[in-house]
């Protein structure tokens, strides 16, 4: 970003938008909805490309992610917020989504396991920050060479500090996630923690191998047993954390 000062009375959100309009050119739009837009930008002084998110969201999630570097998460460069809206400038990951690959052909177990382990590394970092991704699915994984990158933090939230609250308070009040991949507790049945991401990852791993949800067609052998444990309805019966899942894989 250019080293220019804020205009007196200008919010950082307005300043950030002004800097973006001067330094970047919009190449294309990945997504546009009534209240959000995801654009691909090119820096005017180079060929480097970035993703710009313009949407409602939780700035604290992105601030936490700015503090880490992980090969399997996009780097968050800058953000600004105003009245519940966010502008987020993040790393552009070239490549196809995992959904694109699975739509073309199923993956060998070895390749599927490698991708799952890389997403486990991304989740290890997020869970270490106290974050739950809450929308792990093939369309939110970009494959760039041998690198798998978990994207889209619009559904991400912080884990609650006190998971065992009195009845009526120990559950999520906002339903987020994608049908088929979201853990049962994400539908307001219980409080969400990192085990919800393990459920989604288990479903995704099964889809990579069989093309279907594990409830309809479960992968065979040892990997099928790992997937079965990941996707238990009761979170207490799943792997307790992502490290244990990585060991199982």
What are these regions (language model features)?
Residues 69-78:
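Conserved HxN/HPN-centered segment at the entrance to the catalytic loop
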Residues 83-97:
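Conserved short submotifs of the Hanks-type protein kinase catalytic core
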Residues 169-185:
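Conserved activation segment of eukaryotic-like protein kinases, specifically the C-terminal portion
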Residues 23-64:
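ATP-binding glycine-rich loop module of kinase domains
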Residues 115-116:
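Activation segment signature within eukaryotic-like protein kinase domains
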Residues 97-107:
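AlphaC helix of the protein kinase catalytic domain
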Residues 127-143:
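Catalytic-loop of the protein kinase fold
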Residues 185-195:
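Conserved end of the kinase activation segment
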């Amino acid at each position: 970003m250019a080293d220019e000062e804020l205009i007196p009375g200008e919010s950082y959100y307005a300043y950030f938008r002004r800097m973006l309009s001067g330094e970047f050119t919009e190449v294309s739009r990945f997504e546009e909805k009534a209240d959000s837009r995801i654009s691909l930008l090119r820096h005017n002084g180079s060929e480097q490309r970035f993703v710009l998110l313009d949407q409602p969201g939780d700035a604290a999630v992105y601030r936490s992610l700015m503090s880490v570097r992980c090969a399997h998460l996009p780097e968050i460069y800058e953000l600004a917020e105003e009245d519940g809206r966010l502008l987020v400038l993040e790393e552009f990951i070239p490549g196809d989504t995992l959904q694109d690959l699975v739509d073309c052909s199923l993956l060998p177990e070895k390749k599927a396991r490698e991708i799952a382990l890389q997403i486990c590394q991304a989740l290890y970092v997020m869970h270490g920050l106290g974050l739950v991704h809450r929308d792990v699915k093939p369309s939110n994984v970009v494959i760039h060479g041998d690198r798998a990158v978990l994207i889209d933090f619009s559904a991400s939230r912080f884990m609650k500090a006190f998971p065992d609250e009195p009845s009526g308070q120990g559950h999520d009040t906002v339903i987020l996630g994608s049908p088929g991949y979201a853990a049962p507790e994400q539908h307001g049945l219980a409080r969400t923690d990192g085990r919800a991401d393990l459920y989604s990852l288990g479903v995704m791993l099964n889809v990579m191998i069989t093309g279907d949800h594990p409830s309809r067609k479960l992968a065979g052998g040892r990997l099928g047993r790992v997937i079965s444990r990941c996707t238990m309805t009761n979170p207490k019966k799943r792997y307790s954390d992502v490290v244990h899942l990585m060991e199982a894989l």
